[in-house]
């Protein structure tokens, strides 16, 4: 599943091709995505795209009339292509531009979304209760400590809770906890301020580095140019259960936590 770095890499890839371009059509071949594509989505036709933003793992394509809210789901991708590019399987939506280019949405599993919002997007039900962006100053040790106070849940589950901080999915939660030396099952409310300070710094550093490297290469993710990301070459724990720890040589443990695969080092990561 594309996580925050992959979505940000996609935003960076498509934005230069979309901003200040006029939309001449929205071709919907299959409206049966995670939520049905609303007919209102076609209100973007005739509009000029003002900016392309990201909120959590949602891409926001802004016009004066409203905002297209796009989610890549489990396997979705967005590509900038010439308008006459042949349609392939799972090419569900084309945003057609006046300059002869298209933004094509491909989603084999159809867990993605293409919605329309005329309200201030912060008021949309999918966005209104989201926590702070991890790469902004709003995500800091004081905010995290307050959000975790009294919580008995495992820290990894809290780190993946979009009400606490957005965009820290399974891959990067595993990696950040390893880098911070914190056991993923540690009780969130009992982690002291010093360790939380390290954790916040590692979340920011790991996400920023993943964006710089182009996102994580998993079987489904390619960027807006169809190229894979490269961060998977640098993963320390995710997907490496049973292999040796890169720091101490101990075998990495693999468990299920919140129905997600969790990998950690029982020596380097403590409760």
UniProtKB/Swiss-Prot annotation:
Catalytic activity: Hydrolysis of DNA containing ring-opened 7-methylguanine residues, releasing 2,6-diamino-4-hydroxy-5-(N-methyl)formamidopyrimidine; 2'-deoxyribonucleotide-(2'-deoxyribose 5'-phosphate)-2'-deoxyribonucleotide-DNA = a 3'-end 2'-deoxyribonucleotide-(2,3-dehydro-2,3-deoxyribose 5'-phosphate)-DNA + a 5'-end 5'-phospho-2'-deoxyribonucleoside-DNA + H(+)
Residues noted as binding DNA in the record, renumbered to the chain: 90, 109, 151
Cofactor detail note: Binds 1 zinc ion per subunit.
Pfam (any one): zf-FPG_IleRS
Cross-referenced InterPro entries: DNA_glyclase/AP_lyase_DNA-bd, DNA_glyclase_Znf_dom_DNA_BS, Formamido-pyr_DNA_Glyclase, FPG_cat, MutM-like_N-ter, Ribosomal_uS13-like_H2TH, Znf_DNA_glyclase/AP_lyase, Znf_FPG/IleRS
Keywords: DNA damage, DNA repair, DNA-binding, Glycosidase, Hydrolase, Lyase, Metal-binding, Multifunctional enzyme, Zinc, Zinc-finger
Presence of keyword Lyase: yes
Single annotated GO MF: damaged DNA binding
SUPFAM superfamilies noted in UniProt: Glucocorticoid receptor-like (DNA-binding domain), N-terminal domain of MutM-like DNA repair proteins, S13-like H2TH domain
GO terms (BP aspect): base-excision repair
E.C. designation(s): 3.2.2.23, 4.2.99.18
Active site residues per record: 2 (schiff-base intermediate with dna), 3 (proton donor), 57 (proton donor), 260 (proton donor)
Subunit and interaction comment: Monomer.
Function recorded in the entry: Involved in base excision repair of DNA damaged by oxidation or by mutagenic agents. Acts as a DNA glycosylase that recognizes and removes damaged bases. Has a preference for oxidized purines, such as 7,8-dihydro-8-oxoguanine (8-oxoG). Has AP (apurinic/apyrimidinic) lyase activity and introduces nicks in the DNA strand. Cleaves the DNA backbone by beta-delta elimination to generate a single-strand break at the site of the removed base with both 3'- and 5'-phosphates.
NCBIfam families (alphabetical): fpg, PRK01103.1
Name this protein carries in UniProt: Formamidopyrimidine-DNA glycosylase
Origin species: Shewanella sp. (strain ANA-3)
């Amino acid at each position: 599943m594309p996580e925050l770095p992959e979505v940000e890499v996609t935003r960076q890839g498509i934005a230069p091709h979309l901003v200040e371009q006029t939309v001449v059509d929205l071709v919907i071949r299959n409206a049966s995505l995670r939520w049905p594509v609303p007919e209102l989505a076609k209100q973007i036709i005739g509009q000029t795209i003002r900016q392309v933003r990201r909120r959590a793992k949602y891409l926001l394509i802004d016009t004066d009339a409203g905002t297209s809210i796009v989610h890549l789901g489990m396997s979705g991708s967005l590509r900038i292509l010439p308008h006459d590019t042949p349609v392939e399987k799972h090419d569900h939506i084309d945003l057609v531009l006046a300059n002869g280019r298209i933004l094509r949405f491909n989603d084999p599993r159809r867990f993605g979304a293409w919605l329309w919002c005329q309200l201030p997007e912060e008021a949309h039900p999918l966005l209104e209760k989201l926590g702070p962006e991890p790469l902004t100053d709003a995500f800091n040790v004081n905010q995290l400590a307050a959000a975790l106070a009294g919580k008995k849940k495992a820290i990894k589950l809290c780190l993946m809770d979009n009400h606490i901080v957005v965009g820290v999915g399974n891959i990067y939660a595993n990696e950040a906890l390893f880098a911070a030396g914190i056991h993923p099952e540690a009780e969130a409310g009992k982690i002291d301020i010093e360790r939380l300070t390290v954790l916040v710094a590692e979340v920011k550093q790991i996400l920023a580095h993943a964006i710089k490297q182009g996102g994580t290469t998993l079987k489904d993710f390619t960027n807006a140019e169809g190229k894979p990301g490269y961060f998977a070459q640098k993963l320390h724990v995710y997907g490496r259960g049973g292999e040796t720890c890169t720091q101490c040589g101990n075998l990495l443990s693999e468990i299920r936590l919140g129905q997600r695969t969790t990998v950690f080092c029982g020596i380097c990561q403590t409760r």
